[in-house]
Amino acid sequence: LAPDLMTIAKGLTSGYIPMGGVIVRDEVVQVINQGGDFNHGFTYSGHPVAAAVGLENLRILRDEHIVDNVRTEAAPYLQKRLRELQDHPLVGEVRGLGMLGAIELVKDKATRSRHEGRGAGMICRQFCFDNGLIMRAVGDTMIIAPPLVISHAEIDELVSKARLCLDLTLEALGG
């Protein structure tokens, strides 16, 4: 399966400056070229500073082997360490892929029933923020997306803080 077009943005500059674009398959480009002018615009198109930042960012990603390190070191280690949270009484499931992780908060591990109306995710999110950990709550699922350049020691700290915040959340929920 291959897309005909793909929009891209934040990753081009790692969010340092606004930039976006569209990657289009050759077959689509041929159709557009046969049709004459293709008048369009992007909010962040054609800016020379953004283009320079994007090129430099892509160079850094390539030359410093950041994506290779993510694939072989950071992502496998992050996923391994996140899975260690599965034994926590508040955790129904830990899932993830690459540098993304999700921790489902449940009332009962066996049935995976939720803390209905309790806002467990938002309670946990606040404990995370209070303890220097940025995790997003999507309902009662905690989402983590650390930077690509995170070290093993920083992943260890992330998981330690996540466990602390899970403990605090469990206590706040009366567990």
Please state what every model-predicted region is.
Residues 1-175:
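Conserved N-terminal phosphate-binding loop of PLP-dependent enzymes in the Aspartate aminotransferase
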